[in-house]
A protein has these predicted regions:
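Macromolecular interaction modules
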Residues: 1-224
Length: 224
């Protein structure tokens, strides 16, 4: 059964100690997990891997699993922020955020084992209908999983939740691969799979806008 997730990308304010941001965020996700509808969370440190689109400009990802209807859960979170149940520091408004709801296409995701993930956001060319793109990507994902170091993957239809005014995104699809190995090895493995003919490319592939990040877990998975 596919699940729903929330991907919250962020970059802390300039000058803020990274350790302070990390300590605050670990407490912050605990507060959010207390909101009805949030079931699990894990935090990741990010490194840009491919492209210049979202989410390559961020340094941190909080990945939440949401039970039930995401809109209801997000509404409860907003109420918790307004009433102070989820407290925010003075510098919170200076954090750069972009948040997306991921509606499950294939899953459910396993945060407990997800120590290292390769996250791929994408936007198809305008001439490709979204359902056709999602169908193609299901095959593409399985072809990518033939590359060494790529173990399992999950796909989501993206819906923007909090838009970064400095980097608005029109990405509609996210693929999260559970991987092992260093980024140069993973890139080489993908190239080898393509060169060997195990990964096919439609004629419109090069019109896709990609933004990919290499994400290493910086905290254990937490559940409610």
């Amino acid at each position: 059964m596919a699940d729903n997730i929330q991907l919250v990308f962020s970059r802390p304010p300039e000058g803020l100690d990274p350790g302070e941001y990390d300590r605050w965020y670990e407490g912050h996700v605990g507060d959010i997990l207390a909101v009805e509808g949030y079931e699990a969370v894990r935090r990741f440190a990010l490194h840009a891997a491919n492209g210049e689109a979202v989410p390559t400009m961020y340094s941190h990802l909080a990945l939440y699993v949401i039970g039930g209807e995401p809109a209801d859960t997000l509404a409860r979170l907003q109420r918790a922020v307004r009433d102070g149940t989820v407290a925010l520091p003075d510098w919170f408004d200076d954090v750069r955020f972009a948040s997306f709801v991921g509606h499950g296409l294939e899953g459910p995701i396993d945060l407990e084992s997800l120590d290292h993930t390769y996250v791929v956001f994408s936007t198809p060319p305008a001439r490709i209908p979204h359902p056709d793109y999602f169908e193609w990507y299901a095959t593409h994902m399985r072809e990518n999983l033939t590359a060494d170091g790529f173990e399992v993957a999950w796909r989501y239809r993206l819906e923007p939740e909090a838009v970064d005014p400095l980097a608005p995104s029109d990405a509609i699809h996210a693929a999260l691969y559970q991987v092992h190995g260093e980024l140069p090895q993973l890139r080489a493995a993908l190239k080898e799979a393509a060169d060997a003919g195990r990964v096919g490319f439609p004629d419109w592939f090069w019109e896709i806008t990609f933004g990919s990040v290499d994400a290493l877990a910086c905290s254990p998975a937490r559940t409610t």
